[in-house]
């Protein structure tokens, strides 16, 4: 938790001309691309982002648990550019680095493109060092649902392994609540793959 707070403080010294946003969160299970990154346990998370005329840079961090004495913290650095393709389609392109507080775990770098409409999000990420780690994700948003946000997620890897999930979300002024029900990419089971996340916007 102290490492997460340190990252937030580092980003607090930033140019005044950029818009800064951030959040802190707790999740009952840190799930990423169809697999738990915390062995089914809880994790504190935090993120901060700077935006200026479409350009963005940010950092995000989470506690992790891989079942050994290796990494206890993941921290991701990213940057890119958002723009409107048309009235109904927006796009962002950028680069993201995944890092861990263990020198034995190699940094992973991805280039990504993200397309978004009112009802559909599509993302493709390319691992700059290993194409076996490329990733595609499709998110379908349920229309005409005002009480909660409903989103169906489908992810696919180059080896044809896939995962599916259902996201339910509710937002208030500074609080976001999310529930994910996920099919594990390894065993294809939905059982026990449920994560509840509470986030507070800074």
Predicted features, each with a name:
Residues 9-17:
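Hydrophobic core
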């Amino acid at each position: 938790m102290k490492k997460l707070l340190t990252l937030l403080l580092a980003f607090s010294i930033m140019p005044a001309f950029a818009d800064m946003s951030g959040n802190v969160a707790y999740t009952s299970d840190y799930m990423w691309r169809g697999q738990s990154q915390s062995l089914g346990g809880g994790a504190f998370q935090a993120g901060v982002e700077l935006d200026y005329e479409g350009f963005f840079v940010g950092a995000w961090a989470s506690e992790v648990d891989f079942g050994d004495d290796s990494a206890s913290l993941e921290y991701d650095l990213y940057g890119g550019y958002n723009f409107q393709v048309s009235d109904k389609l927006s796009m962002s392109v950028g680069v993201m680095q995944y890092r861990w507080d263990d020198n034995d775990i190699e940094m992973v770098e991805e280039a990504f493109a993200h397309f978004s409409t009112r009802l559909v999000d599509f993302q493709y990420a390319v691992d700059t060092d290993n194409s076996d780690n490329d990733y595609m994700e499709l998110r379908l948003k349920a229309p005409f649902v005002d009480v909660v946000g409903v989103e169906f997620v489908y992810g696919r890897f180059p080896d044809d392994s896939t995962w599916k999930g259902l996201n339910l979300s509710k937002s208030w002024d500074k609080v976001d609540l999310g529930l994910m029900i996920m099919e594990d990419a390894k065993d294809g089971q939905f059982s026990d793959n449920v994560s509840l996340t509470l986030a507070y916007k800074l």
